[in-house]
UniProtKB/Swiss-Prot annotation:
GO BP annotation list: taxis
UniProt family annotation: Belongs to the asfivirus MGF 360 family.
Function, in words: Plays a role in virus cell tropism, and may be required for efficient virus replication in macrophages.
Pfam families: ASFV_360
Domain of life from the UniProt record: Viruses
Protein name per the record: Protein MGF 360-13L
Family matches, as InterPro entries: ASFV_MGF360 (IPR002595)
Amino acid sequence: MSSPLSLQTLVKKTVASTSCLSIDEHILKYCGLWWHDAPLKLYIDRGRIYIKSGFLGEDIDLCVALIIAVKENNYSLIKLFTEWGAYINYSLLSINTKHARDLCRQLGAKETLDDYDIFCIFNKIMHNKTSGSIILCHEIFINNPKLENNFAAQLRRLIYKRLCGLIEIKETDELSELLVKYWYANAVQYDHKDAICFLDEKYTDLDEWRLKCYLCYNKIYELHDIYHKKKIQIDVNEMLSLACIRDNNLLTIYYCYALGGNINQAMLTSVQYYNIGNIYFCIDLGGNAFEEGSAIARQNGYNFLCHSLILNIYSSDASLPLNLKVPEEISSLLKNYKSKNLSIILDYSHKIL
């Protein structure tokens, strides 16, 4: 059973929890409720305690706020956050002075942090899917000597799984390099421009990776900008394959096809990933690698797809212009597009079921 809060701690918690905006700045600073040039506010949502402050302009989980306070050697906030319920062992991830180590030990911290706890912290931060969470994760985890081999291996597996097809598995990859690519991919996927700018300022060799992320996450406007204006280019068929990693990437598939990419290769890549929307869009554009696609489907155990690809019921969509290269025109063309050949196979499957 946790010990009761001291009167001083309870008062601070009450003040931090109030919605009143008229409390004087000097009073808040005197009470230790001022952090990163803003009032420190506390609230509870679904049983989790969050901190509002000026840090990154976002709400932060109390346990994550503790990690930041420890990294900053803000001893008063370390004590306060721990008294409010932060898990003191999380402090071990960012301790960088003997004084902080001694203080956290006095507050009950263990000598080492379990891999499971580290993994929980990582997922807790990344769960928010914001620019701030990416920047925060970078500040806590990049080149952190506290990361042990077991956790590093676990994190590698997570990254390879989430970036399947976008990143090549190499045992020689540095964990820090993988983390940066993972965070950058997240920033592109969810349009977190602040995080993209943050990573671009710190790392100058991400142009090709950015191009690949734009392809994978169907970002046609950004792709057009980097490909034509900044001249960051790779083989067009490799681009088309990257566009087929995720399903329903019609914009970037069309864009790469209009640049001269092989639509049959795109069709086969889509079969490999079982991306049905992509497969039939490729057929709409003239793809006809039916036998090869059926063979790949059979090898992967996609039995219905294997059978459906050898049916003599498909043809290209004559209503699709094949020479558009301006993102606005492509977006307008495909905004409400319904695949002709996907409709054909759906009608066929309804008849036989």
